[in-house]
Swiss-Prot record:
The keyword DNA damage does not apply. It catalyses: ATP + H2O + closed Cl(-) channel = ADP + phosphate + open Cl(-) channel; chloride(in) = chloride(out); hydrogencarbonate(in) = hydrogencarbonate(out); ATP + H2O = ADP + phosphate + H(+). Residues 1384-1478 are annotated as: Interaction with GORASP2. It is a multi-pass membrane protein. The chain crosses the membrane at residues 78-98, 123-146, 196-216, 223-243, 299-319, 340-358, 861-881, 918-938, 990-1010, 1013-1033, 1095-1115, 1130-1150. A lipid is attached at C524, C1393 (S-palmitoyl cysteine). Gene3D superfamilies: ABC transporter type 1, transmembrane domain, P-loop containing nucleotide triphosphate hydrolases. Belongs to the ABC transporter superfamily. ABCC family. CFTR transporter (TC 3.A.1.202) subfamily. Epithelial ion channel that plays an important role in the regulation of epithelial ion and water transport and fluid homeostasis. Mediates the transport of chloride ions across the cell membrane. Possesses an intrinsic ATPase activity and utilizes ATP to gate its channel; the passive flow of anions through the channel is gated by cycles of ATP binding and hydrolysis by the ATP-binding domains. The ion channel is also permeable to HCO(3)(-); selectivity depends on the extracellular chloride concentration. The gene is CFTR. Monomer; does not require oligomerization for channel activity. May form oligomers in the membrane. Interacts with SLC26A3, SLC26A6 and NHERF1. Interacts with SHANK2. Interacts with MYO6. Interacts (via C-terminus) with GOPC (via PDZ domain); this promotes CFTR internalization and thereby decreases channel activity. Interacts with SLC4A7 through NHERF1. Found in a complex with MYO5B and RAB11A. Interacts with ANO1. Interacts with SLC26A8. Interacts with AHCYL1; the interaction increases CFTR activity. Interacts with CSE1L. Residues 1-77, 147-195, 244-298, 359-860, 939-989, 1034-1094, 1151-1478 are cytoplasmic. This is Cystic fibrosis transmembrane conductance regulator. It is found in: Apical cell membrane; Early endosome membrane; Cell membrane; Recycling endosome membrane.
Length: 1478
């Protein structure tokens, strides 16, 4: 970054913002880069500001029992705030003085007041000077207040972040990530936007008092008639604001429904295409869109009338103020024009400035109180350690995550005779109820000496991770003692990668030791992976390590923990994402050899690890089930395996037991309004559900940490359009709304871009507390259905290295992986996409082509615009005719002039006043929009409807290769933020711009006709305005975009820190991350400060141009007007009106250009390539001579009920994810017989899922695949995919009923659906729910276990009558019971079908008749598993002893003595950990 010219700027340069000229020139000539941005002044640095506020806050905490954050802010910023307020008031006072001089100038042209004619020129000079003084005072004052608001935001940002790193884990469980983001974005934005408005809470009343005093002098008591009208108008606007809130609340629920479905569709676009559900999803989303648009139009109309009320009030307030006085006493023309000028200022003060100020104070004080409450929450307490201690010891430890019993726990406990609830992920949603009010750890005691390995085992939710948290100090014991040295290293269960290089992630701030570093890399088997990267270990990893596979991330996390030299190493299931072979090698080389002399506590579920441990601790429901050596375990606890596997699943309970659990669980659903649950005498009577299934429940029953708080299946449709707040004490919408959100802020005030302003929605998954964020896997770590090698296509996103900037390393690492609009709760995987926006290939300024294309989307829009222009021409024409009539009348009056010196309202001169009434009435009709505004707003919303439909169709038809280059968040932003702009902001902004620009043009025409000389001044002014706007816009839009990009790292860094908070604390890296956060803040500040400064430069230049114009008009009017106070009055009044209106029009034009960028982005998506059927290959075969007709309607397919057998032939298949990318599979050929069951094997990332995707034509493929002799080139794409049944690894359950999820097209009867549900073992599950098939699933089927979701996918395949079934690792997250159900269903329902099963566990493939092994992009075939195991020893090592005995019975002796069977503990899977407590 360059040094800022501000540092060396003189007073005048600072006053006129001339120091910004270099960046404006640079931005006009070429595209700006981050390196062009100036460094921030030291007074704006986050370090300086945070230290200042933190010192005052600490002082406040120390001195008072009830500390107030506002006191700390007052001590930091009060006097500057007062100083700028006084300057702002002096600038506003000039507005009240201007009408006095205007009145004197008009009076000087009275025929009977020739004495003052000589001083008219001096009065004109005075009037011009007032405008100059106002310009010189207002702009520095407003900029100073914005600058101070920015500094307050920065200081509070830092304070909140530092507090977040100190929060206790208990508090983190009660705060969602969405609330933290809301705290840092919505609430703090109020300082940026509103501080300049805050002073009007006292300036506006003073203005009103001053103006009413001046009006009393003119009109006496009748002046209060105008004020009364304005007060009524303000109340009317407040009422309209409340009405709009109601519409918005209702509409927010509908938007939420649509966006939830859209989000689910985008996230699962592979599944949508695989199931051929494009039309079904389009229909569902469009139906929701229709309902939403009805409310959108109502909201727009209310906002339109609210906006219009300000315009039409001008005429009425003058009319009501003047008419009573004129009827009683008569009135002279001077008083009329003076009153008009006074009322313009009075109207702004009463209807705009004061309501805005009150709203600003209400919102700001509310934000300060929220931040104050947050800053006083309980902090993490560092335990006292003894550095000389070598042992690790616990004595009778008991600990709670959260005290207090919930009603649900009590009732569930009463319904269970032994008071114990099974603890695994084998039921619907009832796991861990027993942990609700009970200790997470009970009476735990153990002792391990230096150098020993303690293996901790237990079922999911037994308290294993809680044990490590206790040792780290994250969980405070309520009883007992802990003893260790305090020198700890920690490896989280779910790998955490910070933005940075591979080396930085491993070293993590510890001093670099080359030998140790190389040893750790080698032990963690990272050498080979690192060597493949072009930059080796200096390769930059995006947030979360998106470019790495799950196994690579796990190994880097493990390497980080081992590299640190510590006394005690806590390893929380570090091998969860490694294949069996890699896990075995790393355990040996790393845990057993490299760390042999260190004390280690390893959480594991593997029998091999237990055998090699010095001590074993097995936990069950928080208690010590066993502690000792492995030799003791076999003799003392022979049943430990079956006990901890948790076979007591939901499906094995009695019907009464299941009904009881389900009843109690559903009873906790907080259903609002008509979505209530009624229960009668313990039996489910009814369960009404509205269509608002998109409204997601707030909390998860599955998380016992959250289970004492209510959640809802269908929330009330309250939504905060501009935020993501959740507060139990107040509704999502603010309680006070004097002005609608779109109306807040004067036109000259910049809008902060710290958060997107589109409507937000509740995302795809259940509410995430911060603790859940830390204790659940990153979404990257799920093995996606379609992935390849190291380039995981996760959410269709990749981060090309070439996109990374060269300036701010940390910021560039953070900013590239983010995006997505979510509402009141934002989920962890959505946060990184929350602030992302796709801006590539979008020009800095909206092109004329975009405007033209937008206008021609809807034919009616062209006619409406022509209609608006016709009405405008009629108005201007009528005004000119009126002027001509008045002029003619005036000439006649001069010839018959009388000695009447008392110009009452019925005099000839009052004809000018009648003309003003005429113009006012015309403007009133214009403002009301009876002929112009409403049709325009209505048509623009229709345009938005069409664009949404076109974009939805385009996205659904786009090939998967397109999605591999787009982010899910970027796509969803088009449907959320950009469509919201098209719905809400753009119609009203275009209306305002059209209205304002026509008012200005009309006024200019009238002024020019009244005084033709003025027209000569008008032309250069208009040219100067157009050139200046074009000059500024080119730079400002680029600065705005750079600011938007710089905003991303702030929030991404917060989420990254939260995800790795336990690791940060264990390594003591909080100061380092605070420094990185300040760096991200400073980067954003540099962009935002420069944008504010250039905007003020532009606003000031615009005002200087029109002050010049007003001076010219004033002097021309004074010098060329003879006897005729009417004409000079009209000229000067209209010129002053132009002054106040034109700047508003200029800002509206900039807003329109900025909002039209959303239209550009939407058009970019509409223009995406379409997924087309592959062209047929030229061949001599008769069946392929139908050319294009063959693709549309294949006769062979139609007549023979294709496919009839399911025989597949693959010839020379090559698959790539993107055009020009590396081939994942190359020249693969094999054949599969009809009805054969084929196993697909390979290590993680070898291409198993890729091959399944290639079968479905989801990738860029070459070669040929035939089904029953029919080539894929000769079959329509949809029909080809319908030949396959699919059970993807990433299960797709969308928000809707069971019926919709099974049969979205509504093709099957209830009898068929129940029959299939029974076949796959779903019937008993569905019957438990009220409404049965019509029960609405929300939040991706959150009330179902992963196994039940897999069964739904299986049922879809059965209903599809497919002859070929593709299964992508179906056993990955299943409990044994559900897996047995799937195996049974496969045998029965798909007995005569071809089954292709992708697995990396050989145990799951014992029943396959044939095997395909993928290695190095090639496929090898094996006819039997015995042959596979014999030839591939690596796979043989992965088979358990019991399975080996089944495969090779001849090798086993019957003379072996039987002994107690010991099997491995059930592996904890990603889904289980998500749905259970620590």
């Amino acid at each position: 970054m360059q040094r800022s010219p501000l540092e060396k700027a003189n007073v005048f340069s600072k006053l006129f913002f001339s120091w910004t000229r270099p960046i404006l020139k640079k931005g006009f000539r070429r595209r700006l880069e981050l390196s062009d941005i100036y460094q921030i002044p030291s007074c704006n640095s986050a370090d300086h500001l945070s230290e200042k506020l933190e010192r005052e806050w600490d002082r406040e905490l120390a001195s008072k029992k009830k500390p107030k954050l506002i006191n700390a802010l007052r001590r930091c910023f009060f006097w500057r705030f007062v100083f700028h307020g006084i300057i702002l008031y002096l600038g506003e006072v000039t507005k009240a003085v201007q009408p006095l001089l205007l009145g004197r100038i008009i009076a000087s042209y009275d025929p009977d007041n020739k004495a003052e004619r000589s001083i008219a020129i001096y009065l004109g000079i005075g009037l011009c000077l007032l405008f100059i003084v106002r310009t010189l005072l207002l702009h520095p004052a407003i900029f100073g207040l914005h600058h101070m608001g920015m500094q307050m935001r920065i200081a509070l940002f830092s304070l909140i972040y530092k507090k977040t790193l100190k929060l206790s884990s208990r508090v983190l469980d009660k705060i969602s990530t969405g609330q933290l983001i809301s705290l840092l974005s919505n609430n703090l934005n109020k300082f940026d936007e509103g501080l300049a408005l805050a002073h009007f809470v006292w300036i506006a009343p003073l203005q009103v008092v001053l103006l009413m005093g001046l009006l009393w002098d003119l009109l006496q008591a009748s002046a209060f008639c105008g004020l009364a009208f304005l007060v009524v108008l303000a109340l009317f606007q407040a009422w309209l604001g409340q009405m709009m809130m109601k519409y918005r609340e209702r509409r927010a629920g509908k938007i939420n429904e649509r966006l939830v479905i859209t989000s689910e569709m985008i996230d699962n676009i592979q599944s949508v295409k695989a199931y051929c559900w494009e039309e079904a999803m389009e229909t569902m989303i469009e139906n929701l869109r229709q309902t939403e648009l009805k409310l959108t139009r109502k909201t727009a109309y209310v906002r339109y009338f609210n906006s219009s009320a300000f315009f039409f009030s001008g005429f009425f307030v003058v009319f009501l103020a003047v008419l009573p006085y004129a009827l009683i006493k008569g009135i002279i023309l001077r008083k009329i024009f003076t009153t008009i000028s006074f009322c313009i200022v009075l109207r702004m003060a009463v209807t705009r400035q004061f309501p805005w100020a009150v709203q600003t104070w209400y919102d700001s004080l509310g934000a300060i109180n929220k931040i104050q409450d947050f800053l006083q929450k309980e902090e993490y307490k560092t335990l006292e350690y003894n550095l000389t201690t070598t042992d690790v010891m616990m004595e009778n430890i008991t600990a709670f995550w959260d005290e207090g019993f919930g009603d649900l726990f009590i009732k569930v406990k009463q319904s269970n005779s032994d008071g114990k609830i099974p603890n695994g992920d084998h039921g619907l949603f009832f796991s861990n109820f027993s942990l609700l009010g009970t200790p997470v750890l009970k009476n735990i005691s153990f002792k391990i000496e230096k150098g020993q390995l303690l293996a901790v085992a237990g079922s999911t939710g037994a308290g294993k991770t809680s044990l490590l948290m206790l040792i780290m100090g994250e969980l405070e014991p309520s009883e007992g003692k802990i003893k260790h040295s305090g020198r700890i290293s920690f490896c989280s269960q779910f790998s955490w990668i910070m933005p940075g290089t591979i080396k930085e992630n491993i070293i993590f701030g510890v001093s670099y030791d080359e030998y140790r570093y190389r040893s750790v890399i080698k032990a963690c088997q990272l050498e080979e992976e690192i060597s493949k990267f072009a930059e080796k270990d200096n390769t930059i990893l995006g947030e979360g390590g998106i470019t790495l596979s799950g196994g690579q991330r796990a190994r880097i996390s493990l390497a980080r923990a081992i590299y640190k030299d510590a006394d005690l190493y806590l390893l929380d299931s570090p091998f969860g994402y490694l294949d069996v072979l890699t896990e075995k090698e790393i355990f040996e080389s790393c845990v057993c050899k490299l760390m042999a002399n260190k004390t280690r506590i390893l959480i594991t579920s593997k029998m091999e690890h237990l055998k090699k441990a010095d001590k074993i601790l097995i936990l069950h429901e928080g208690s010590c089930y066993f502690y000792g050596a492995f030799s003791e375990l076999q003799s003392l606890r022979p049943d430990f395996s079956s006990k901890l596997m948790g076979f007591d699943s939901f499906d094995q309970f009695s019907a009464d037991r299941r009904s009881s659990i389900l009843t109690e669980t559903l009873r906790r659903f907080s259903i609002e309004g008509d979505a209530a649950v009624s229960w009668n005498e313990g039996k489910m009577q009814s369960f009404k559900q509205t269509g608002d299934f998109g409204e997601r429940r707030k909390n998860s029953v599955l998380s016992p940490l959250n289970s004492n708080r209510k959640f809802s299946v269908v929330q009330k449709g309250q939504q905060q359009m501009n935020g993501i707040e959740e507060n139990d004490d107040e509704p999502l919408e603010r309680r006070l709304s004097l002005v609608p959100d779109s109306e807040q802020g004067e036109a000259i005030l910049p809008r902060s871009n710290m958060i997107n302003t589109g409507p937000t929605f509740q995302g795809r998954n259940r509410r995430q507390s911060v603790l859940n964020l830390m204790t659940r896997p990153s979404v990257h770590q799920g093995q996606g259905m379609y992935r390849t090698g190291n380039a995981a296509v996760r959410k269709m996103s990749m981060v090309p290295q070439s996109q990374l900037s060269e300036i701010d390393i940390y910021s560039r690492r953070l900013s590239r992986d983010s995006g997505m609009d979510i509402s009141d709760e934002i989920n962890e995987e959505d946060l990184k996409e929350w602030f992302f926006d796709d801006v590539e290939n979008i020009p800095a300024v909206t092109t004329w082509n975009t405007y033209l294309r937008y206008i021609t989307v809807h034919k009616s829009l062209i006619f409406v615009l022509i209609w608006c222009l016709v009405i405008f021409l009629v108005e201007v024409g009528a005004s000119l005719v009126g002027l001509w009539v008045l002029k003619e009348t005036s000439l006649k009056d001069k010839a018959n002039t009388t000695n009447n010196t008392y110009a009452v309202i019925i005099t000839n001169t009052s004809k000018y006043y009648l003309f003003y009434i005429y113009v006012g009435v015309a403007d009133t009709f214009f403002a009301l929009g009876l002929l112009r505004g409403l049709p325009l707003v209505h048509t623009l919303i229709s345009v938005s409807k069409i664009l949404h439909h076109k974009m939805l169709c385009s996205v659904l038809k786009a090939p998967m290769s397109t999605f591999s280059t787009l982010k899910a968040g970027g796509i969803l932003n088009r449907f959320s933020k950009d469509i919201a702009i098209l719905d809400d902001l753009l119609p009203l902004t275009i209306f305002d711009f059209v209205q304002l620009i026509l008012i200005v043009v009309g006024a200019l025409i009238v002024v020019s006709v009244l005084q033709p000389y003025i027209f000569l001044a008008t032309v250069p002014v208009i040219i100067a305005f157009i050139m200046l706007r074009a000059y500024f816009l080119q730079t400002s839009q680029q600065l705005k975009q750079l600011e938007s990009e710089a905003r991303t790292p702030i929030f991404t860094h917060l989420v990254t820190s939260l995800k790795g908070l336990w690791t940060l604390r264990a390594f003591g890296r909080q100061p380092y991350f605070e420094t990185l956060f300040h760096k991200a803040l400073n980067l954003h500040t540099a962009n935002w400060f420069l944008y504010m400064s250039t905007l003020r430069w532009f606003q000031m230049r615009i005002e200087i141009i029109f002050v010049t114009f007003f001076c010219i008009v004033t002097f021309i009017s004074i010098l060329t007007t003879g006897d005729g106070e009417g004409r000079v009055g009209i000229l000067l009044t209209l010129a002053m009106n132009i002054m106040s209106t034109l700047q508003w029009a200029v800002n509206s034009s900039i807003d329109v250009d900025s909002l039209m960028r959303s239209v550009s982005r939407v058009f970019k998506f509409i223009d995406m390539p379409s997924e087309e059927p592959l062209p047929p290959k030229p061949t001599k075969s008769k069946k392929n001579q139908l050319s294009q007709v063959l693709i549309i309607e294949n006769e062979h397919v139609k007549k023979e009920n294709w496919p009839s057998g399911g025989q597949m032939t693959v010839k020379d298949l090559t698959a790539k994810y993107i055009d020009g990318g590396n081939a994942v599979l190359e020249n693969i050929s094999f054949s599969i017989s009809s009805g054969q069951r084929v196993g697909l094997l390979g290590r993680t990332g070898s291409g198993k899922s890729t091959l399944l995707a290639a079968f479905l034509r989801l990738l860029n493929t070459q070669g040929d695949i035939q089904i029953d002799g029919v080539s894929w080139d000769s079959v329509p794409l949809q029909q080809w995919r319908k030949a396959f049944g699919v059970i993807p690894q990433k299960v797709f359950i969308f928000s809707g009923t069971f019926r919709k999820n099974l049969d979205p097209y509504g093709q099957w009867s209830d009898h068929e659906l129940w029959k299939v549900a029974d076949e796959v073992g779903l019937k008993s599950v569905i019957e438990q729910f009220p409404g049965k098939l019509d029960f609405v699933l929300v939040d991706a089927g959150c009330v179902l276990s992963h196994g039940h979701k897999q069964l739904i996918c299986l049922a879809r395949s059965v209903l599809s009558k497919a002859k070929i079934l593709l299964l992508d690792e179906p056993s990955a997250h299943l409990d044994p019971i559900t897996y047995q159900i799937i195996r049974r269903a496969l045998k029965n329902a798909f007995a005569d079908c071809t089954v292709i099963l992708s697995e990396h566990r050989i145990e799951a493939m014992l029943e396959c008749q044939r095997f395909l092994v993928i290695e190095e992009s090639k496929v090898r075939q094996y006819e039997s598993i015995q042959k596979l195991v014999t030839e591939k020893r690596l796979y043989g090592q992965a088979i358990s002893h019991s399975d080996r005995m089944k495969l090779f019975p001849h090798r086993n002796s019957s003379r072996h003595k039987s002994r107690a069977k010991i099997t491995a503990l059930k592996e904890e899977t990603e889904e289980e950990v998500q749905e259970t407590r620590l």
